[in-house]
């Protein structure tokens, strides 16, 4: 049970739910530019497993790392933090 606590978690916004039991989550990171030392926003997309097809576009969700479920899918939905308005 302790091993699950070591898994990575990310919070992001659902940008697509067109696939069956799969959502695409956009996660935003703030990284420091190596030369200019400015904080730059970096966005990357993750495919996550949504077992019950309960997410809608615009929802803010928490995803957790898991074993590979398909070619691109290595994350699963933990909870829906807030619903789209």
Curated annotation (Swiss-Prot):
Similarity-based family: Belongs to the universal ribosomal protein uS17 family.
Going by the entry's taxonomy, the superkingdom of the source organism is recorded as Bacteria
Q: Which UniProt keywords apply?
A: Ribonucleoprotein, Ribosomal protein, RNA-binding, rRNA-binding
The biological process GO terms on file are: translation
Q: Does the keyword RNA-binding apply?
A: yes
Subunit record text: Part of the 30S ribosomal subunit.
Cellular compartments per GO CC:
cytosolic small ribosomal subunit
Q: SUPFAM superfamilies, from UniProt?
A: Nucleic acid-binding proteins
Role, per record: One of the primary rRNA binding proteins, it binds specifically to the 5'-end of 16S ribosomal RNA.
- Native organism: Lachnospira eligens (strain ATCC 27750 / DSM 3376 / VPI C15-48 / C15-B4)
The record, for CDD domains, names: Ribosomal_uS17
Q: What is this protein called?
A: Small ribosomal subunit protein uS17
Gene Ontology MF term list: rRNA binding; structural constituent of ribosome
């Amino acid at each position: 049970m302790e091993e699950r606590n070591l898994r990575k978690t990310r919070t992001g916004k659902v940008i697509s739910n067109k696939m069956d039991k799969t959502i695409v989550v956009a996660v935003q990171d703030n990284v420091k530019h190596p030369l200019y030392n400015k904080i730059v926003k970096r966005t990357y997309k993750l495919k996550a497993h949504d077992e019950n097809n309960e997410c809608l576009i615009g929802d803010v969700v928490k995803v957790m790392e898991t074993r590979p479920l398909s070619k691109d899918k290595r994350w699963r939905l933990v909870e829906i933090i807030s619903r789209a308005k």
